[in-house]
C-alpha cells in the first residue's frame, strides 16, 4: 500500500471569551490500491475537547475510516455510520457537526481557527 499525506492540520479552538475549548486535528492521506480504502482516501478528523487542565476527550467528535470499520463517526462516546462522498463534504460535515455540538456556527469555528 502506497500512501501520501495530503492534509495535516491542527487548529486550537477558543470561545468568544478566548477560553480554550480544544484541538481540531485533520489528517488525510491519498491511498493507492488498498481494498480497505476503496475511495482512495484514508482520513481522521478529531475534535479533542478540553475536559480538564491537561485532559482531553478524543471521542467527543471524531470522523474516521479505520480499515476494519469503514467510514464512521464517534460522537460523545457513541459510534454512528458515515457515508463518505468527498474530502470537501467530509470537512463540511465535521465542522457542521462540531458547531451543533458546541453551539457555534461553521464560520465562527473557522474564524477562531
Language-model segments: what does each one mean?
Residues 1-71:
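The feature represents the first ordered module of a protein
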Residues 111-113:
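Intrinsically disordered, low-complexity charged/polar segments
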Residues 76-109:
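Short, compact, well-ordered microdomains
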Amino acid at each position: 500500500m502506497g500512501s501520501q499525506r495530503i492534509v495535516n492540520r491542527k487548529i486550537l479552538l477558543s470561545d468568544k471569551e478566548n477560553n480554550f475549548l480544544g484541538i481540531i486535528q485533520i489528517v488525510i492521506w491519498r491511498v493507492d490500491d488498498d481494498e480497505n480504502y476503496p475511495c482512495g482516501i484514508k482520513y481522521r478528523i478529531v475534535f479533542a475537547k478540553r475536559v480538564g487542565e491537561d485532559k482531553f476527550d478524543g471521542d467527543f467528535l471524531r470522523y474516521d475510516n479505520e480499515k476494519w470499520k469503514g467510514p464512521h463517526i464517534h460522537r460523545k462516546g457513541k459510534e454512528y455510520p458515515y457515508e463518505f462522498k468527498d474530502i470537501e463534504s467530509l470537512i463540511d460535515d465535521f465542522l457542521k457537526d462540531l458547531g451543533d455540538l458546541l453551539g457555534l456556527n461553521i464560520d465562527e469555528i473557522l474564524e477562531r481557527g
